């Protein structure tokens, strides 16, 4: 039965949940509800109340469910990704920000807070490989008075970053992180990066990632995926002042490699790994000598 036929919202969501579960979607009930809420223009709380009433299924619901069943990312269908306190615009050509990156942002924010208490004058932060602009937008809106700069190379991702950083005060540069922002060399307080880091022969497990995230945002270059992380670390070393802070996200299995990368360069001290909310090694940081 088509979910667009005259059935109740509750029955439509129940049917959509079954369709998505059969397709292997990891959170079928939540996604079914979010798709309905998106079409109805309501939040999940209001939708929950509507499910107990006599509301009809919204027109076009089955089409969106079919797209999600084909493993198109939920965020691409709704056009929205939630990150920390932000509602970001996302779609084809841009990496969908992940919840685990929120903890990386928090590390940078904590350092900026301490620096602001210890120093007079404005602070500066750089996001290398900003993608959707999630990290830069978080820094710009949560760290008062910090001058934020963001760099993105992808022609496809750059417009999404422009949209998400509009009105935040952040400065966005369209260019390669390896040679960007030379005018800031030796002056920046904090650098954050979530660079591409997947090894060349690794195949992402999730179909949403494998089929829809841009390869440019996934694969780090080289057999071990370390080319772009190495470049990010080198640029951070160039940009940061002595005593500046660098934090970079990576895969759980790359923690030792990232620590060795920073420790072996001679540019960093107090190198350490950080776990995310699931207890997995998610980031490595260091302080500029």
Where are these regions (language model features)?
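Conserved SAM/SAH cofactor-binding pocket of Class I
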Residues: 100-206, 231
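Short, flexible, mixed-charge acidic loops at enzyme active sites
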Residues: 80-81, 201-215
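Glycine-rich S-adenosyl-L-methionine
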Residues: 155-158, 208-241, 245, 251-253
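Conserved AdoMet
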Residues: 29, 36-111
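Non-catalytic accessory regions of SAM-dependent methyltransferases
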Residues: 1-48
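Core SAM-dependent methyltransferase catalytic element
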Residues: 260-289
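Conserved beta-strand segments of alpha/beta enzyme cores
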Residues: 87, 147, 169-171, 269-272
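Short, electropositive alpha-helical surface patch
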Residues: 247-265
């Amino acid at each position: 039965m088509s979910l667009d036929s005259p059935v109740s919202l509750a029955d439509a969501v129940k049917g959509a949940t079954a369709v998505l579960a059969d397709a292997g979607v990891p959170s079928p009930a939540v996604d079914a509800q979010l798709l309905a809420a998106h079409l109805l223009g309501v939040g999940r709380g209001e939708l929950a109340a509507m499910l107990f009433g006599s509301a009809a299924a919204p027109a076009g619901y089955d089409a969106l469910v079919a797209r999600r069943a084909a493993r198109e990312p939920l965020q691409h269908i709704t056009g929205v990704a939630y990150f920390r306190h932000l509602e970001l615009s996302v779609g084809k050509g841009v990496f969908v920000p992940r919840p685990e990156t929120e903890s990386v942002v928090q590390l940078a924010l904590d350092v900026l807070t301490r620096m602001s208490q210890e120093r007079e004058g404005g602070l500066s932060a750089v996001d290398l490989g900003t993608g959707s602009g999630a990290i830069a937008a978080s820094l710009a809106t949560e760290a008062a008075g910090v001058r934020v700069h963001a760099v993105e190379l992808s022609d496809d991702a750059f417009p999404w970053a422009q949209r998400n950083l509009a009105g935040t005060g952040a400065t966005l540069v369209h260019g390669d992180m390896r040679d960007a922002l030379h005018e800031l060399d030796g002056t920046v307080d904090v650098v954050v990066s979530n660079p591409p880091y997947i090894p060349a022969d690794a195949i992402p497990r999730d179909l949403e990632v494998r089929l829809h995230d841009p390869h440019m945002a996934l694969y780090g270059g080289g057999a071990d995926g370390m080319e772009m992380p190495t470049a990010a670390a080198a640029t951070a070393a160039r940009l940061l002042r002595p005593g500046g802070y660098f934090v970079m996200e990576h895969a759980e299995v790359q923690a030792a490699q990232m620590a060795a990368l920073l420790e072996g360069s001679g540019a960093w001290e107090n190198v350490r790994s950080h776990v995310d909310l699931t207890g997995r090694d998610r980031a490595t940081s260091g302080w500029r000598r």
